[in-house]
From Swiss-Prot:
GO terms for cellular component: cytoplasm. Disulfide bonds: none annotated. Its EC number is 3.1.3.5. This is 5'-nucleotidase SurE. Coiled coil: none annotated. InterPro entries: SurE (IPR030048), SurE-like_Pase/nucleotidase (IPR002828), SurE-like_sf (IPR036523). It is an enzyme of class 3 (hydrolase). Keywords: Cytoplasm, Hydrolase, Metal-binding, Nucleotide-binding. It catalyses: a ribonucleoside 5'-phosphate + H2O = a ribonucleoside + phosphate. The keyword Protein biosynthesis does not apply. Belongs to the SurE nucleotidase family. It comes from Pseudothermotoga lettingae (strain ATCC BAA-301 / DSM 14385 / NBRC 107922 / TMO) (Thermotoga lettingae). Its main location: cytoplasm. The keyword Ion transport does not apply.
Length: 259
């Protein structure tokens, strides 16, 4: 396969380069990644300003390009310009740090995969614990085996897989749902040399989801979580409830009385 790799940690990130080296043993690899860290950029794209792209000689086994854009930009340019739309799969990662629960809203890594799904190719976001001695080689071989054996045709269009690795040895993988995992934010006021006040944000993880099939629960038990996510944010159940209100007698009465 021709696989496009990106990330949000930057083009020299260990997780990205090790994954690229492992996958290059069986696949054609194109790396297009931000020249510097783009963590927590979400699904931002660059408009009304240039996106610079340059080939870098980080590794010689396959082409690697650094851009001034976001992960979503990298996927767009990689697929539509550098690869002339000849890409079979997009993989974003391996990210340094998990992307669980509501992390996916903020994650540049996840958004890189969702951009691939939006462009119509099988796409994966891959994240790992943020620790120095994490075994990226083992994780990369897991991903290599996974993409060879998983039937991506079973997924609905515009769906990506969000994959997270556990801290220790891998017991296997489990299909999971996105958890209710939020942050209790803290803001520390600081002063710059000119006397201006700025803020430094911290966040304490709040994991209050009791379901055993949620992503962080599975990861905490030593399994790889595989969560299907979509580019669409529609709440189907709420839409049905809203339609009931729209078609209800009370709504029609209120509308007529206000006309």
């Amino acid at each position: 396969m021709k696989i496009l790799l990106t990330n949000d940690d930057g083009v020299t990130s260990q997780g990205l380069l090790i994954l690229a080296k492992v996958l290059s043993q069986k696949h054609n690899i194109l790396v297009v990644a931000p020249e510097s860290e783009q963590s927590a950029t979400g699904h931002a794209i660059t408009v009304r300003m240039p996106i610079w792209v340059k080939r870098v000689r980080v590794l010689e086994e396959f082409p690697i390009y650094a851009t001034t854009g976001t992960p979503a930009d990298c996927v767009k340019i990689g697929m539509e310009v550098l690869a002339n739309k000849q890409i079979d799969m997009v993989i974003s990662g391996i990210n340094i740090g998990h992307n669980l629960g509501t992390d996916v809203i903020y994650s540049g890594t996840v958004s890189g995969a969702l951009e691939g799904a939006l462009l119509g190719v099988p796409s994966i976001a891959v994240s790992a614990p943020a620790r120095e001695n994490f075994d990226y080689y083992s994780a990369s071989f897991f991903i290599s085996n996974f993409i060879e054996n998983f039937d991506f045709s079973i997924l609905e269009p515009f769906t990506a897989l969000n994959i997270n690795f556990p801290e220790g040895d891998i017991k296997g993988w489990k299909a999971t749902r996105q958890s209710i995992r939020r942050y209790a934010d803290r803001f520390e006021a600081r002063t710059d040399p000119s006397g201006n006040t700025y803020y430094w944000m911290y966040g304490d993880v709040v994991e209050d989801d009791s379901a055993t099939d949620c992503d962080y629960c599975v990861v905490s038990k030593g399994y790889v979580s595989v969560t299907p996510i979509t580019v669409f944010m529609l709440n189907e159940r709420a839409l049905l409830q809203l339609k009931e209100v729209e078609n209800g007698k009370e709504n029609k009465t209120s509308w007529r009385s206000g006309s």
